[in-house]
Design a protein with these regions (language model features):
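N-terminal zymogen propeptides
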Residues: 1-80
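Predominantly the structural core of cysteine protease catalytic domains
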Residues: 2-20, 91-94, 104-105, 130-276
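Intrinsic-disorder/low-complexity coil detector
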Residues: 15, 35, 52, 59, ...
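A generic signature of intrinsically disordered, low-complexity regions enriched in glycine/proline
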Residues: 23-24, 29, 35-39, 83-88, ...
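General structural signal for secondary-structure boundaries
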Residues: 27-28, 39-42, 116-126, 130, ...
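Substrate-binding/charge-relay-adjacent region of secreted/lumenal peptidase catalytic domains
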Residues: 59-149
C-alpha cells in the first residue's frame, strides 16, 4: 500500500484519508446547507445496553500488519465480502438517518459474510417508524432497537427512492422486513480504536462495525483496517452518501478520526435463504 498527497492507494484506487490536518475543512464542506446529504449522529443521546459487551481479546498492534496481510491474501475482510456480494452504498439523502443507514449497511455486509449475495436492504422504514416520521438524528443502539422491533425490508419491497411513510402498512414490506429483524450486536468500548481494529481484524470472525463519530456528527461503518504508513493505521469506512462520495462511497479515517464515541459490531444476522 502506498500513500500519496491525494490519500491512500488501494487496488489502484485513491481513497481519501481524513486526519487532523484536513478534518475541519472536510466537515465544513458537508455542513454547507446546499449539500444534498445530511449527517445525524447525536452523541449526546447515546445510551448503552443495546448489545452484549465486546467478547473478544484486544489484538496487540504488533500483530496487525500480519492480519491485514492475511485478510488481503484470503479476501476475508468484511470489505472483501461487501464488494464480492455487491452490497450497495446507501443513500440517506437529506434525512438525518445516518445512524440507521450506517447500521443497515453493516447489516447488509454481515449478510454478505453469511453468503447472501445481491441483498439490498432499505434502512428508511425502521428509522421513519422509530422517529414517528420526523427528520431527526439518532445513534446506533437506537437503530438496533428499531430493527429488532420492525426489521428492515429489501429495496424490492420498499424502493430506495421512497422517502416517506406511504408503504408502512404494506403487507409485502412487513414480510420482507421481518426476514431481517434479529440482529446480534456487541458494544465496543467507547473511544477505543484498538477494540474497533480487533473486531474488524479478527482472523476467524471479522465483523463490520458502526462508527458513531462525535467530531463529525455522523455515523458510518468500518469494513477494513489499513496501514496508512509504517506503524500508523486507519479504518476504511463506507458512507451513506451514494457512490459519489469519496471513492465508490468509501474513504479512510486515520486513527485520530476513527476513534468513535459509539461502536457496535454486527456479530450475526437472522438466517435467510439466498436472494433469488
Amino acid at each position: 500500500m502506498n500513500v500519496t498527497e491525494f490519500g491512500m492507494v488501494e487496488d489502484g484506487q485513491k481513497l481519501p484519508v481524513i486526519d487532523d490536518s484536513n478534518a475541519s475543512d472536510f466537515v465544513k464542506v458537508f455542513d454547507d446547507d446546499r449539500n444534498p446529504f445530511r449527517s445525524g449522529f447525536e452523541s449526546s443521546e447515546v445510551k448503552t445496553g443495546f448489545g452484549s459487551p465486546f467478547s473478544r481479546s484486544i489484538i496487540p498492534r504488533k500483530e496487525w500488519p500480519d492480519l491485514i496481510r492475511h485478510h488481503e491474501e484470503n479476501k476475508s475482510s468484511p470489505d472483501h465480502h461487501r464488494i464480492h456480494a455487491g452490497v450497495p452504498v446507501m443513500n440517506q439523502a437529506n434525512w438525518g438517518y445516518c445512524w440507521m443507514y450506517g447500521f443497515g449497511g453493516a447489516m447488509n455486509t454481515a449478510y454478505a459474510q453469511a453468503g447472501i449475495k445481491g441483498l439490498r436492504l432499505n434502512p428508511f422504514m425502521p428509522a421513519w417508524l422509530g422517529k414517528g416520521g420526523r427528520n431527526v438524528g439518532g445513534f446506533g443502539g437506537e437503530a438496533k432497537k428499531y430493527v429488532n422491533k420492525w426489521g428492515m425490508p429489501e429495496e424490492s419491497a420498499w424502493p430506495e427512492n421512497v422517502k416517506n411513510g406511504s408503504l408502512v402498512e404494506n403487507h409485502e414490506v412487513e414480510l420482507s422486513a421481518k426476514m431481517h429483524d434479529a440482529i446480534v450486536v456487541e458494544e465496543l468500548e467507547r473511544n477505543n480504536f484498538d477494540a474497533l481494529a480487533s473486531c474488524i481484524l479478527d482472523p476467524e470472525r471479522p465483523c463490520p462495525a458502526t462508527m458513531g463519530l462525535a467530531w463529525w456528527g455522523h455515523l458510518v461503518y468500518g469494513v477494513k483496517v489499513v496501514m496508512i504508513s509504517p506503524g500508523k493505521f486507519g479504518i476504511k469506512f463506507v458512507n451513506s452518501w451514494t457512490i459519489k462520495y469519496g471513492k465508490e462511497g468509501c474513504g479512510v479515517l486515520a486513527e485520530s478520526k476513527a476513534t468513535a464515541f459509539e461502536q457496535l459490531a454486527i456479530v450475526s444476522v437472522k438466517p435467510r435463504v439466498a436472494v433469488s
